[in-house]
């Protein structure tokens, strides 16, 4: 007997959703939520945030004529319900997989995705740009930005709101508040007030009243100002929207973000209002799945889990992530040095600092999504004789370029930059790849750069940085794990700046490996030796200071050399190294293995490496082919 179709089975695009009666929307929300739970329990992905926006997403596509009306999602990891309703339901099981759906909005995937996102705080700027463009060409469509309560506190979001309040363009910002941080008045009074504020009757007669006051001689303008202050004061007492009104936004809320029918009715009213409007809704991360409701941080991003109780595989306990090494080592150092501080821009969990924060809360500074502030803040701490470890993802450090230059490197302030997720990050994709950092770090005055090729290197560098105060220093490492048994957290090893390792010496070709490329370099060297070639393998962990003289000496007796760099070829280490080669050695350079200057899409690191021929086997094949072409034979 054929299974009866669900409501969701009949919906592939928003136009079909809009044909569903309003009273059926709660059932659709239930089915969308169950679809996400069923799918992600098998494959993993961003979880709690997506469960929290199901009703909002259904309401948005029900009320607005998408894609003509523009939805701009901030960050974007909460767009799985959006993807389900915009023609990608049957592909959700490929999300974050190689050649599958992106975990974020992506223009190439769908006309419903306006921008490729991944970083926080951009949506209001983009929505305002859309609204300004619309009005310039005299078109007619709605523009809606959806932003979370953490993202709206970013400097960029506040700058955009300030500009939007000045321009007075018709646009809607939906504040998705799931932490209750600015939401104390959810209930009948705020609901009653919102019904008044959004009514056509109220807004029409308010405009008439204020227009009348402007025409009154002498007392008119003063009376208008008085009544506006009374109106604002009344709303400030009953709602938390004073800040947004001060920025020039009409404020509605807080509203229950899980009452889809009320959301639809409220959005229908809000879209008829003039000027910039902020609709504040309250949601719960993990809504509808008990384990995620109880621990939304744990279930923010999940691996495959048992649907019945949310149990996830603990993974390989013999390995430890580079991020966890950082947190563990900083805790060890802080035990004996009260001047150490760890700084992170809203990435305590991701940067491996959870246990550190619990053990040394007064030494941990989570500055929020404020990368620019975090770098200047760290620089100033050094002026107070504090030893700051600035823990940040490579992709987010690019947001603080001006502060890196002016507030740290030009003044030679000894900030310790601990740069996580450098190189290829895998499933997070193009907006999170850490492929730019070496290019700009090596261009900064005074900045020392260390690229560990293993976990012990990272431990040794973190310990060495504690006492190093001559300049700022950056260490960068991949999103990867290492064998725990290979590590000694208490070993006292003195790093020697400007040194490198030589694993083997040969005469045909030298492989110069930069940091995390060492594993592929070792595989390539073994393959080349199996083909009868004599290989030099150099593990170049110090980029600045660079042991240029010693490196040139190593290359004297080889016929040619290649560089292996997990960065963009045009903005990595190649130019930096070649500028320091002798003329004789410079002529021996044949190739850099790195990423071409194009967006590097998501997939497991191994798959991405194979696509771009950066795995050991592919490197060996290409090197052997070049040597054969140039008559360098075994």
From Swiss-Prot:
Binding positions for thiamine diphosphate per the UniProt entry: 77, 118-120, 150-151, 178, 289, 371
Any GO BP: thiamine biosynthetic process
GO cellular component: cytosol
EC number from the UniProt entry: 2.2.1.7
Pfam families assigned to the protein according to its UniProt record, in alphabetical order: DXP_synthase_N, Transket_pyr, Transketolase_C
Catalytic activity reported: D-glyceraldehyde 3-phosphate + pyruvate + H(+) = 1-deoxy-D-xylulose 5-phosphate + CO2
GO molecular function: 1-deoxy-D-xylulose-5-phosphate synthase activity; magnesium ion binding; thiamine pyrophosphate binding
InterPro entries: Dxylulose-5-P_synthase, THDP-binding, Transketo_C/PFOR_II, Transketolase-like_Pyr-bd, Transketolase_C, Transketolase_CS
Enzyme class: transferase
Cofactor note: Binds 1 Mg(2+) ion per subunit.
Residues the entry annotates as binding Mg(2+): 149, 178
Domain of life: Bacteria
Family, similarity comment: Belongs to the transketolase family. DXPS subfamily.
Name of the featured protein: 1-deoxy-D-xylulose-5-phosphate synthase
């Amino acid at each position: 007997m054929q299974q009866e179709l669900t409501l969701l089975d009949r919906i592939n695009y928003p136009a079909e959703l809009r044909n569903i009666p309003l009273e059926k929307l709660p059932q659709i929300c239930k089915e969308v939520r169950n679809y996400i739970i069923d799918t992600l329990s098998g494959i993993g992905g961003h979880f709690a945030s997506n469960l929290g926006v199901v009703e909002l997403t259904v309401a948005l596509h029900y009320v607005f004529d998408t894609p003509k009306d523009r939805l701009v999602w901030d960050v974007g990891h909460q767009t799985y319900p959006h993807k389900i309703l915009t023609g990608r339901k049957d592909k959700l099981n490929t999300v974050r997989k190689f050649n599958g759906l992106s975990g974020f909005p992506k223009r190439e995937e769908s006309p419903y995705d306006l921008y490729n996102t991944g970083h926080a705080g951009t949506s209001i700027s983009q929505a305002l740009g859309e609204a300004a463009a619309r009005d310039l060409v005299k078109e007619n469509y709605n523009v809606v930005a959806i932003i979370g309560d953490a993202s709206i506190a970013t400097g960029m979001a506040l700058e955009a709101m300030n500009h939007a309040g000045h321009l007075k363009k018709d646009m809607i910002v939906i504040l998705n508040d799931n932490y209750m941080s600015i939401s104390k008045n959810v209930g009948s009074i705020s609901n009653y007030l919102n019904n008044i504020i959004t009514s056509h009757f109220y807004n029409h007669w308010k405009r008439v009243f204020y227009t009348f006051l402007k025409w009154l001689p002498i007392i008119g303008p003063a009376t208008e100002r008085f009544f506006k202050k009374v109106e604002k004061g009344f709303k400030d007492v009953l709602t938390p929207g004073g800040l947004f009104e001060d920025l020039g936004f009409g404020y509605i809320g807080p509203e229950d973000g899980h009452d889809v029918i009320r959301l639809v009715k409220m959005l229908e009213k809000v879209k008829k209002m003039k000027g910039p409007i902020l609709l504040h809704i309250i949601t719960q991360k993990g809504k509808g799945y008990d384990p995620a409701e109880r621990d939304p941080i744990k279930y923010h991003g999940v691996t495959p889990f048992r649907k019945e109780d949310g149990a996830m595989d603990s993974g390989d306990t013999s390995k430890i992530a580079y991020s966890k090494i950082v947190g563990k080592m900083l805790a060890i150092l802080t035990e004996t040095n009260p001047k150490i501080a760890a700084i992170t821009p809203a990435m305590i969990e991701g940067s491996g600092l959870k246990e550190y924060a619990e053990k040394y809360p007064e030494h941990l500074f989570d500055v929020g999504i404020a990368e620019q502030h975090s770098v200047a803040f760290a620089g100033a701490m050094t002026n107070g004789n504090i030893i700051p470890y600035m823990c940040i993802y490579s992709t987010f450090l690019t947001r603080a370029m001006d502060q890196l230059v002016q507030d740290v490197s030009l003044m030679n302030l000894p900030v310790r930059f601990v740069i996580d997720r450098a190189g290829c990050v895998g499933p997070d994709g193009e907006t999170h790849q850490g492929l730019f950092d070496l290019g700009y770090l090596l261009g900064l005055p005074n900045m020392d750069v260390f690229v560990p090729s293993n976990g012990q290197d990272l431990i040794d560098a973190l310990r060495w940085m504690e006492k190093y105060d001559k300049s700022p220093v950056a260490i960068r490492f991949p999103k990867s794990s290492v064998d725990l048994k290979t590590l000694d957290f208490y070993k006292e090893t003195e790093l020697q700046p400007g040194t490198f390792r030589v694993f083997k010496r040969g005469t045909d070709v030298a492989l110069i490996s930069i940091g995390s490329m060492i594993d592929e370099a070792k595989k390539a060297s073994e393959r080349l030796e199996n083909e009868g070639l004599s290989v030099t393998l150099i593990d170049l962990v110090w980029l600045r200071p660079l042991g240029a003289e010693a490196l040139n000496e190593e290359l004297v007796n080889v016929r040619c050399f290649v560089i292996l760099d997990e960065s963009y070829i045009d903005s990595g280490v190649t130019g930096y190294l070649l500028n320091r080669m002798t003329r004789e050695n410079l002529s021996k350079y044949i190739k850099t293995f790195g990423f071409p200057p194009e967006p590097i899409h998501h997939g497991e690191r191994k798959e991405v490496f194979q696509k771009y021929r950066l795995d050991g086997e592919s490197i060996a094949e290409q090197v052997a082919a070049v040597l054969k072409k140039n008559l360098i034979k075994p």
